[in-house]
């Protein structure tokens, strides 16, 4: 295999590393720079003289790695942990049954001669994650990986990954690709970086855009993000036509070499629902030819997290129930939990049809996995079905690990997936919806980079980040206004409250429901609410008595900040509960009527995304050539009125807030907007 000069240089570094006293080698490489080629060459070399452990964070990534290198590759979990064992508690009441699946760290017989290669290393978690029902080693997979390799006894580990991709969930950085992380542990580190895009991929518009995002991540000042487009390579699709384009491609290609990538589990669920409606004409249960995304490794069936499988046939459906003790309103109660299963035929890892059970409840849920109570119900139901098996025995554990229901496939519909779920995968045609990831902060850019680089041939995009400086644009200082126009928001219709019937203004009722949601799981309660003209009096029950708060509001039920009649030690927290309105549900559906408004919308939306501010409405006013962006900032409503002249030039903006220049979040948005023009 012919290597580029840069790859050859790094290969020589690897050879020197194997024979050195260094323990960790970090190989960083961006999209299109030949990381997989390097992994194969390195694996071939190491396998000649050392024990090679080739692994990846997900099952899908491990399977791809095995196919591309010709070496056996497994998930990190399968490589470093022993066969699971169960710690079960003996109980009299079956509903009290508890268990914990434990997998201890496996130490290979090869001892210090092991060399581990971890591909897709940006996904390796380095924080402790404890779970009520599972225990994997020390619950820190990075620490356990190092224990498995035993670097202090001569073992070595090579991390290969893309530093521009998303870090593990809940971590600001990918520590597997950070030299400082290992040096702080007393380990000697060698590092190298692949930066040259291979010649055959150099003309790819997809990679050009990826490199643009990569370069932005390296800059402190970020003021331009515009995707390059080219037909059949990178194409923009309007939100209205996005789903249709995806469905047309599926119909024409007859393959499953395409996917929609979006930001949240909720958005993925909506896309999957709409796609199935378009395919089958109604919200029908799982059926033949549906696509599933495996969400949890299943070693019994050899189907791995991140793999996509077609449904070959659908068989019998059945329900299993079990009593489980759970907390309801602070009281422990026994409830019956019912889980739904369906028998399906899917391809096994060799492509041959196999029958298995699928846990159907998870398919359409917005949750990433089943709840702890549902997991307990699975276990308790097994105990009910096998009353003669004694928990803690080898026979019990063997039966549980082979039970078709306890080990049922856990999956989501696989037409649309999140940015984290798509990591480690590639598709010929990828459809990316960048909604909520259009900011210039690191998180948004890494998400955009990860989603963008999943496409091998064609990238179709919608709600794309598009940020450019506007040469004639200026922004006035923030003005304090006495009122915000009622058009600032359109609320969804809300139900009555214990203190308001349906004749009361919808916004007043929405405010109550928002406060009621905020006050849950706190030591406070709403005692009474008294309605007066443009005033809601909330009497809040605290551990020390009842406190009164006055909530004045303007036309359209635009509430000002709450005022405590008698401030005390509870006031600060209660004011936060009363003022926070993020739980309010708005009808926000804006489509720009022309290009200038579209550019403005992308700019304002990006600024709001960056600091997590909610846009509540956008209104175009043709009579004075303006567009008004309304938003919820610093506990109150604010707006930015922007004027666009007849030629489409954006001239100036007037920001206004009910609290004037004290509106910190509006000020931050103005700073972000201004930064684009410096």
Regions found by a protein language model. Give the residues of each.
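C-terminal accessory regions
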Residues: 330-506, 513, 539-545, 562, ...
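Short glycine-/polar-rich loops that comprise or flank the Walker A/P-loop
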Residues: 50, 153-155, 187-192, 256, ...
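Intrinsically disordered, low-complexity regulatory segments enriched in Ser/Thr/Pro
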Residues: 543-579, 628-671
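ASCE P-loop NTPase helicase motor core
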Residues: 11-12, 16-221
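Conserved helicase motor core of P-loop NTPases
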Residues: 10-18, 22-23, 140-155, 163-312, ...
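Conserved SAM-binding loop
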Residues: 3, 54, 260
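N-terminal pre-Walker A segment at the start of P-loop NTPase domains
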Residues: 1-12
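Short Lys/Arg-enriched alpha/beta "domain-start" segment
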Residues: 490-547, 570-638, 646
């Amino acid at each position: 295999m012919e290597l580029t000069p840069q790859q050859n240089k790094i290969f020589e570094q690897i050879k020197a590393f194997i024979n050195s006293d260094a323990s960790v080698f970090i190989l960083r490489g961006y999209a299109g720079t030949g990381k997989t080629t390097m992994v194969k060459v390195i694996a071939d070399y190491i396998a000649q003289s050392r024990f090679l452990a080739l692994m990846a964070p997900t099952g899908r990534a491990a399977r791809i790695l095995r196919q591309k290198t010709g070496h056996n590759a497994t998930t990190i979990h399968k490589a470093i942990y022993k066969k699971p064992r169960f710690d079960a508690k003996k109980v009299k009441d079956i509903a009290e049954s508890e268990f914990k699946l434990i997998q201890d760290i496996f130490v290979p017989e090869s001892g210090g001669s092991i060399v581990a290669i971890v591909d897709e290393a940006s996904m390796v978690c380095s924080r402790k994650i404890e779970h009520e029902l599972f225990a994997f080693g020390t619950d820190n997979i990075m620490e356990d990986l190092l224990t498995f390799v035993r670097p202090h006894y001569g073992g070595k580990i090579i991390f290969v990954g893309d530093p521009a991709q998303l870090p593990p969930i809940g971590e600001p950085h990918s520590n597997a690709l950070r030299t400082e992380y290992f040096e702080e542990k007393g380990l000697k580190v060698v590092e190298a970086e692949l930066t040259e895009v291979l010649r055959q991929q150099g003309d790819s518009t997809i990679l050009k855009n990826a490199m643009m995002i990569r370069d932005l991540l390296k800059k402190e000042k970020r003021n331009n993000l515009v995707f390059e487009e080219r037909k059949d390579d990178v194409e923009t699709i309007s939100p209205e036509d996005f789903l249709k384009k995806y469905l047309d491609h599926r119909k024409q290609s007859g393959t499953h070499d395409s996917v929609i990538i979006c930001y949240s589990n909720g958005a993925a669920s909506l896309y999957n629902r709409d796609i199935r409606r378009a395919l089958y004409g109604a919200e029908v249960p799982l059926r033949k030819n549906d696509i599933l995304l495996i969400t949890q490794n299943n070693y019994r069936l050899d189907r791995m997290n991140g793999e996509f499988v077609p449904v070959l046939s659908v068989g019998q459906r059945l329900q299993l129930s079990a009593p489980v003790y759970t907390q309801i309103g602070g009281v422990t109660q026994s409830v019956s939990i019912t889980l739904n299963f369906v028998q399906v035929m899917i391809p096994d890892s060799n492509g041959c049809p196999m029958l298995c059970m699928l846990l159907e409840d998870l398919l359409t849920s917005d949750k990433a996995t089943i709840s702890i109570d549902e997991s307990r119900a699975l276990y308790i139901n097994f105990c009910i079905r096998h009353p003669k098996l004694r928990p803690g025995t080898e026979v019990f554990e063997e039966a549980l690990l082979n039970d078709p229901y306890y080990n049922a496939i856990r999956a989501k519909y696989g037409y649309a997936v999140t940015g984290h779920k798509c990591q480690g995968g590639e598709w010929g045609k990828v459809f990316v919806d960048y909604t909520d990831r259009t900011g210039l902060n690191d998180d948004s850019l890494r998400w955009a980079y990860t989603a963008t680089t999943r496409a091998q041939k064609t990238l179709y995009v919608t709600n794309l980040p598009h940020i450019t400086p506007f040469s004639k644009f200026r922004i006035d200082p923030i003005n304090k206004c006495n009122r915000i126009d009622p058009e600032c928001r359109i609320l969804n219709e809300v139900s009555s409250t214990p203190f308001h019937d349906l004749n009361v203004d919808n916004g007043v009722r929405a405010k109550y429901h928002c406060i009621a949601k905020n006050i849950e799981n706190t030591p406070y309660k709403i005692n009474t609410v008294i309605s007066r003209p443009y005033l809601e009096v909330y009497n809040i029950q605290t551990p020390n008595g009842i406190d009164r708060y006055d909530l004045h509001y303007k036309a359209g039920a635009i509430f000002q900040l709450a005022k405590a009649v008698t401030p005390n030690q509870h006031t600060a927290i209660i004011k936060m509960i009363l003022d926070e309105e993020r739980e309010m549900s708005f009808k926000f559906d804006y489509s720009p009527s022309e290009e200038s408004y579209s550019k403005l919308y992308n700019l304002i939306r990006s600024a709001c995304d960056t600091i997590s501010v909610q846009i509540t409405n956008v209104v175009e006013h043709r009579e004075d050539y303006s567009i008004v962006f309304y938003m919820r900032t610093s506990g109150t409503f604010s707006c930015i009125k922007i004027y666009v002249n007849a030629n489409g030039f954006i001239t100036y903006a007037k920001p206004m807030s009910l609290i004037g220049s004290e509106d910190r979040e509006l000020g931050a948005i103005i700073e972000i907007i201004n930064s684009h023009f410096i």
